[in-house]
């Protein structure tokens, strides 16, 4: 059986933590930032965890992570 391929777009967006949870970056931070408040932009910094309902989909896309 051939090797499973990693979805490269998912590999660039997600990283697996040591405990097994998957981290992702926040959305809505790329452009159109002038109308967003400073507080809103500050809260969009950093990383967030992938929700449990999306975990199976992400794991399928990252078979070797």
From Swiss-Prot:
Stored Pfam families: Ribosomal_L35p
Gene Ontology cellular component list: cytosolic large ribosomal subunit
Swiss-Prot/TrEMBL keywords: Ribonucleoprotein, Ribosomal protein
Keyword rRNA-binding attributed: no
InterPro entries from the UniProt entry: Ribosomal_bL35, Ribosomal_bL35-like, Ribosomal_bL35_CS, Ribosomal_bL35_sf
GO biological process: translation
Source organism superkingdom: Bacteria
Tagged with keyword Ribonucleoprotein: yes
GO MF term (any one): structural constituent of ribosome
NCBIfam families on file: rpmI_bact
Family that this chain belongs to: Belongs to the bacterial ribosomal protein bL35 family.
Record-linked PANTHER family: 54S RIBOSOMAL PROTEIN BL35M, LARGE RIBOSOMAL SUBUNIT PROTEIN BL35M
HAMAP family (UniProt xref): Ribosomal_bL35 (MF_00514)
Name of the protein this chain belongs to: Large ribosomal subunit protein bL35
Organism: Nitrosomonas europaea (strain ATCC 19718 / CIP 103999 / KCTC 2705 / NBRC 14298)
Gene designation per UniProt: rpmI
């Amino acid at each position: 059986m051939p090797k499973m391929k990693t979805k490269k777009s998912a590999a660039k967006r997600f990283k697996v933590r040591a405990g097994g949870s998957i981290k992702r970056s926040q959305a809505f931070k790329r452009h159109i930032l002038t109308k967003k408040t400073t507080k809103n932009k500050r809260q969009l910094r950093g990383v967030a965890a992938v929700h449990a309902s999306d975990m199976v989909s992400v794991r399928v896309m990252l078979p070797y992570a």
